[in-house]
Regions:
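ATP-dependent carboxylate/acyl-activation modules
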Residues: 1-190, 194-307, 319, 341-380
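C-terminal hydrophobic structural anchor segments
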Residues: 303-342
């Protein structure tokens, strides 16, 4: 679960990380009131759960009340990457002497927390890694021993920093690590961590994403995860009990497991563009597959649907009944390709073929994708 920036900043402030003076606004008048209390100039930042807000016009500056009125009204009537802007964060505009980067995430290979720092803040850390890797340093933390302040100091010395910056920055690293540990964060990030003219530090941006599996263990006031899923298709997926991730392509995907789903996406992505990732979590009932078809078909401009299911204990012919019912009721015109193997597979093939589905009986997902490509051709 990713928190909004204003929520992450509140947590940072509670844990003694210096953050800007700020206030949340849902109307232009509220934004004016907050700015009046803070003092101009101010930053207005759209609060949506996507990255790249700045490039999309979601982070703006206002130096006067009149300018703020225009900017606030424009932001609150806009959307960022398809998500409507309902809240804006109004915060003081910091005087910047230097921009740094600090992030803590989980290394997918070792499973350990890794602290990443860079003297190049305000840009994507991935870009810095490509263009100036010498400006990045990282250290893994062994959970068996925990974090010690000397590790942060050693890390910062690797970047050749002076002592007057190492001391306060190492303090922030320790505070952010405590937050990441306490909230079981997948990522905790400050980008940029600003150096002020007086030498102080200020976290002018905050990212905090909490592992969904940890939510039941965190005894703190956190918003319900469903409330922050702003994409209506992803919200609907959660409502029906499947994992749905909206993508930018035009080939809908339904799978009965994460592995099948990711394999389908990867192979389809070589020549075509997936419209979504959807996995049922193992459930293959008629009602669930009907709802999955309904969900995938909500995406506009689909060219085809690709179904990849396997049933060990689950009888997959029940799911086929749901697919067939949806096709019959909604007169689906686009091609549907299915690879369905396992319990009651022959009966499943008969049901799907009778509904007009292109059934591929080979075990290799590549064969089914080849059939899909024959029907729809390359990505457009």
């Amino acid at each position: 679960m990713r928190l909004h920036e204003y929520e992450a900043l509140d947590i940072f402030e509670q844990n003694r990380i210096p953050v800007p003076h700020r206030g949340l606004a849902t109307t232009m008048h509220e934004a004016l009131q907050v700015a009046g209390e803070i003092g101009y100039p101010v930053m207005l930042k759209a609060q949506v759960l996507v990255g790249g807000r700045g490039l999309a016009g979601g982070i703006r500056t206002a130096s006067t009340p009149d300018e703020l009125k225009d900017v606030a009204e424009e932001l609150l009537s806009s959307d960022i990457k398809g998500l409507p802007v309902r809240k804006i964060l109004v915060c003081e505009k910091a005087e910047i002497a230097r921009e740094l980067y600090l992030g803590i995430t989980i290394d997918g290979y070792s499973g350990r927390p890794v602290i990443v720092v860079s003297t190049e803040g305000g840009v994507l850390i991935e870009e810095t890694a490509q263009t100036a890797p010498e400006k990045i340093a990282a250290i893994h933390i062994d959970p068996s021993f925990g974090y010690y302040p000397y590790q942060a100091r050693s890390l910062l010395r690797m970047l050749g920093l002076k002592q007057q910056l190492i001391a306060p920055w190492s303090d922030v690293i320790g505070q952010l690590y405590d937050i990441a540990l306490r909230y079981e964060a997948l990522i905790a990030e400050i980008n940029p961590l600003v150096v002020l003219p007086n030498g102080g530090l200020l976290a002018v941006d905050a990212v905090l994403e909490i592992d969904d599996s940890a939510l039941s263990r965190i005894r703190r006031s956190l918003p319900d995860r469903a409330e922050r899923i702003e994409n209506p298709l992803e919200r609907r997926g959660r409502e029906i009990g499947v994992t749905y991730v909206d993508l930018e392509g035009d080939i809908g995907i339904i799978s009965s497991g994460a592995g099948l789903g990711m394999a389908s996406m990867d192979i389809i992505g070589q020549k075509m563009k997936p419209a979504n990732f959807l996995e049922t979590g193992g459930g293959i009932t008629a009602d669930l597959l009907y709802k999955c078809m309904q969900l995938v078909m909500m995406k506009p401009d689909l060219r085809a649907i690709f179904i990849n299911v396997y049933g060990g204990i689950n009888p997959i012919h029940e799911g086929a009944k749901g697919v067939a019912r949806y096709i019959a009721e909604h007169k689906v015109k686009i091609p549907i390709v299915a690879k369905a193997l396992g319990n009651h597979q022959e009966e499943t093939w008969e049901i799907l073929r009778a509904a007009g589905v292109h059934v591929v009986t080979e075990a290799a997902t590549e064969k089914a994708v080849e059939k899909l490509y024959e029907l729809v051709g390359p990505a457009k």
